[in-house]
Regions:
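Transmembrane alpha-helix boundary signature
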Residues: 67-81
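Membrane-embedded catalytic cores of phosphoryl/pyrophosphoryl-handling enzymes
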Residues: 22-23, 38-39, 44, 52, ...
Length: 267
């Protein structure tokens, strides 16, 4: 514990307004509004399958992270003698493992797996390390929280990405539903309302994926370009942008409505 406190004190000792702003931006980059908007753009506008893979990894990792937090119940460093934490209003719940770190690791590892480009590897690595370090700089997590957030994020993202590829290729919806079993069993271990909410998020994605894949089958830019001839008189780019904008606005509005309803039912 002394080593962890000393690490946090080191970050505390180098604080200045410029670094405060820098690390604050990094930590905000992985919070719900930003992640939701970026993922929604990927899913509804750019490439549906990439978006689904990203969503599966994110929802599963968030559920796992919340479950571990509620099981371990590790206190945060906030309030520890000699430490001054910043932006504590968003550092709610238990400490281990770091939710921001695991979410950032999941998001950027997923994009690295999807795109497999050098620039994405570099950007992803910078963001993964940066978000984790921002949690230490702000003094809202112990080093062990961040380290395990990195490890869990990488391991589970690789696992769920491969699982999604198998499910999507073979249309094995039963296998996808079976992944919920260990999550459901864990409800009786942690008995946590927060975990149940996150499990609901994962369940919602799985059911939504099955319904969309079997019945709706909307197109994103990749499928749209395949179906529309570029020699057509229709301005395909303009037509697609308008459809994507409508879909994005409607989707965000629906998500906001669901969020408000859920928070009203389970405040």
């Amino acid at each position: 514990m002394n080593i962890q406190i000393n690490i946090l004190k080191f970050f505390q000792s180098i604080r200045n307004p410029i670094l405060n702003a820098f690390f604050l931006i990094l930590t905000i980059s992985t919070e719900v509004p930003v992640i939701v908007i970026l993922t929604a753009i990927m899913y509804w506008c750019i490439n549906k399958k990439y978006g689904q893979k990203l969503l599966f990894s994110l929802t599963a990792n968030i559920a796992i992270n919340t479950g571990i937090k509620e099981y371990v119940k590790a206190p945060r460093p906030i309030g520890t003698e000699g430490l001054e934490s910043l932006r504590v209003s968003t550092a709610t719940g238990y400490s281990f493992p770091s939710g921001h770190t695991q979410t950032a690791t999941t998001f950027w590892t997923s994009l690295m797996i999807i795109f497999r480009q050098k620039w994405m590897y570099i950007l992803g690595l910078i963001m993964i390390l940066g978000v984790g370090l921002s949690r230490l700089y702000l003094g809202v997590h112990w080093p062990i929280d961040v380290i395990c957030g990195w490890i869990f994020g990488i391991v589970f993202t690789i696992m769920f990405s491969k699982l999604f590829d198998i499910v999507d290729k073979n249309k094995d919806y039963k296998l996808l539903l079976l992944t919920l079993i260990p999550f459901i069993i864990f409800i009786f271990i942690v008995k946590s309302e927060s975990y149940i909410k996150m499990l609901g998020l994962l369940s919602g994605f799985i059911l939504g994926y099955i319904i969309e894949d079997k019945f709706i089958k909307f197109n994103t830019i990749d499928e749209y370009k395949k179906e529309i001839s570029f020699s057509s008189k229709i301005d395909t780019n303009k037509d697609y942008i308008v459809k994507s904008a409508y879909r994005f606005i409607l989707g965000i509005f629906t998500l906001l409505l669901v969020f408000l309803i859920v928070n009203y039912i389970m405040p």
